Swiss-Prot record:
Residues at the site labelled Important for activity: 267
Keyword NAD: yes
Cofactor(s) the record lists: Mg(2+); Mn(2+)
Membrane-crossing residue ranges in chain numbering: none
One Pfam family matching this protein: malic
Protein name: NAD-dependent malic enzyme
GO biological process: malate metabolic process
Catalysed conversion reaction: (S)-malate + NAD(+) = pyruvate + CO2 + NADH; oxaloacetate + H(+) = pyruvate + CO2
EC number: 1.1.1.38
InterPro entries: Aminoacid_DH-like_N_sf, Malic_enzyme_CS, Malic_N_dom, Malic_N_dom_sf, Malic_NAD-bd, Malic_OxRdtase, NAD(P)-bd_dom_sf, NAD_malic_enz_proteobac
Length: 562
């Protein structure tokens, strides 16, 4: 019997049920349930279906005049009736995705303390480092299977938001459920409150976090280590997603824990997976391979380098050697093109630095090799922006790229919208509609020369929900690079442009459930093949994915004793 058809036995009654968002039905409680659970008189007379409730909620939603108020309204529904929240979001996924996550979630993080209403998730503060296990046991969620954790230091492109960063784990887990069918009862957002270096927060009397400079060094490492060990003891089968950690911590934490626990970093690996999937779709539509492309990056931090390494791995899988693949990738940061003779390269940048000998004959304007110099000399066919700095894909740069590449692939991926390297409208105008554009944040379609261009949102929400569903369904103990590569290829297989030669690069969000299931199967299959999960047939994996896919429907309740 499907979970939503199986009755749920509850040992409590009265107002306590109405205050529990996972089980509250509001006006949808039946006459029988109202009697059995002492709810008579606590609700209006009319008994509604979930669709009737969702219709009223949407009517209220449309009365708000700005996106932040809409976000707050939806969060209020989530904190009172989660099933209704997810039905509403699923009914209007394209419209509401930018409200519950990027770009609106950025504003919500900045105003988190000012707008705080109800508790959700766990805040683990450094002064409580000796009580982490107790805090985990205080969680209202007992069967946690997916955790998203942040320390709030690098929230989107907004920097240090302290505990305000909690908006990101909450939003990400909302997408695990609305896109990937993960039951909200299995999800837990966590913020590691290690202080903040944001002076505005430290001076803000409303700031609700630990009012202290951020800890670092060994103190920080020991705190995170204590957290990881405590989580593993409490929920040994949970998938842990690292989210919005600063560059100095993101890659070291991933390298330290990826072979110890079932974990991944969405900023590094999820962004890489969705970008590679989008590039594979673009290449397939052009009847070419990724290994034939020359790729320039603006932004050489952990996210950019993570994407580049995933691209190199895919190129190698297509038949070229690693050295050749790396020679076709050009990483540009604030100091110019990364070269192997540069001092102070970070560990994860070293393998992606160009050989100085290979660029010694380039014609350059100044001492450092700029992005424009890369355009004029390397003649890239793909341009990816992960700089977090707006407007850096200038008209001059895009036109220089278009001069040597008739159909340039341009991905300005920085979030939120205010940080994007170039708008799709500008890129399409500068290339007379010839560029293939995907962005990190949502943009409206662009009208040009009598055509309407749908802008693909190269958003991690296409990838991480499917990864989570696949890991959960297979019972995987690790998230391997091969599992992530499988997710990229599975996403590319869903591309309307690649499949039909027309349409958007990525499937519409209305199809996200099918996409997530397709990705989940690919991920789960590789997990089994690599021994990260118990042996299982394809048929049983597919059935497990269906069984684990939660839908926003009310269950029947029956009374039981404690």
């Amino acid at each position: 019997m499907d979970d939503h058809k199986r009755p749920l036995y509850l040992p409590f009654a009265g107002p306590a049920i109405l205050e529990a968002p996972l089980i509250n039905k509001g006006s949808a409680f039946t006459d029988e349930e109202r009697v059995f659970f002492n709810l008579e008189g606590l609700l209006p007379h009319v008994i509604e279906t979930i669709e009737e409730q969702a219709s009223r909620a949407y009517d209220q939603y449309t009365n708000f005049t700005n996106d932040l108020d809409r976000h707050i309204y939806l969060r209020n529904i989530q904190d009172t009736n989660e099933t209704l929240y997810y039905r509403l979001v699923q009914n209007h996924i394209t419209e509401m995705m930018p409200i519950i996550y990027t770009p609106t979630v950025g504003m919500a993080c900045e105003r988190f303390s000012k707008n705080y209403r109800r508790n959700r998730g766990l805040f683990i503060s450094y002064p409580h480092k000796d009580r982490i296990e107790d805090i985990l046991n205080n969680s209202t969620r007992q069967k946690v299977k997916i955790i998203v954790v942040t320390d709030g230091e690098r929230i989107l492109g907004l920097g240090d938001q302290g505990i305000g960063g909690m908006g990101i784990p909450i939003g990400k887990l909302s997408l695990y459920t609305s896109c990937g069918g993960i039951s909200p009862a299995y999800t837990l957002p966590i913020t590691l409150d290690v202080g903040t270096d944001n002076p505005h927060l430290l001076e803000d009397p409303m700031y609700m976090g630990w009012r202290n400079q951020r800890i670092g060094g060994e103190e920080y490492k020991e705190f995170v280590e204590a957290f990881m060990q405590a989580v593993n003891r409490r929920w040994p089968d949970a998938l842990i997603q690292f989210e919005d950690f600063a560059q100095k911590n993101a890659m070291p934490l991933l390298e330290r824990y990826k072979d110890q626990y079932c974990c991944f970093n969405d900023d590094i690996q999820g962004t890489a997976a969705v970008t590679v999937g989008s590039l594979l779709a673009a290449c397939k539509a052009a009847k070419s391979q990724l290994c034939e492309q020359r790729i320039a990056f603006l932004g050489a931090g952990s996210a950019g380098c993570g994407i580049a390494e995933a691209i190199v791995a895919q190129m190698v899988s297509e038949g070229i050697d690693e050295a050749q693949a790396r020679s076709q990738v050009f990483m540009v940061d604030r100091w110019g093109l990364l070269q192997d003779n540069m001092p102070n390269l970070l560990n994860f940048q070293e393998k992606l630095a160009q050989k100085t000998q290979a660029v010694k004959d380039w014609t350059i304007e100044n001492g450092n090799i700029s992005l424009l110099d890369v355009m004029n000399n390397a003649k890239p066919t793909v341009l990816i922006g992960v700089s977090g700095a707006p407007g850096l894909f200038s008209e001059e740069i895009i036109k220089a790229m278009h001069q040597h590449c008739p159909r340039p692939i341009v991905f300005p991926l920085s979030n939120p919208t205010s940080r994007v390297e170039a708008t799709p409208k500008d890129v399409l105008h500068w290339t007379n509609g010839q560029a293939l554009v995907a962005t990190g944040s949502p943009f409206e379609p662009v009208a040009l020369n009598g055509e309407t261009f749908e802008i693909a949102q190269c958003n991690n929400s296409y990838i991480f929900p499917g990864i989570g569903l696949g890991v959960l369904s297979a019972g995987a103990k690790r998230v391997s690079d091969e599992m992530l590569m499988a997710s990229s290829r599975a996403l590319a297989e869903c591309s309307p442009l690649a499949l039909n030669g027309e349409g958007p690069l990525l499937p519409p969000l209305e199809e996200i459930h099918q996409v997530s299931k397709h990705i989940a199967f690919a991920v789960a299959k590789v997990a089994v093949e690599q021994g990260h999960a118990l042996p299982c047939t394809d048929e049983l994996l597919a059935q497990s994915i269906e069984n684990n896919f939660w839908t926003a429907e009310y269950r029947r309740y029956k009374r039981t004793s404690f």
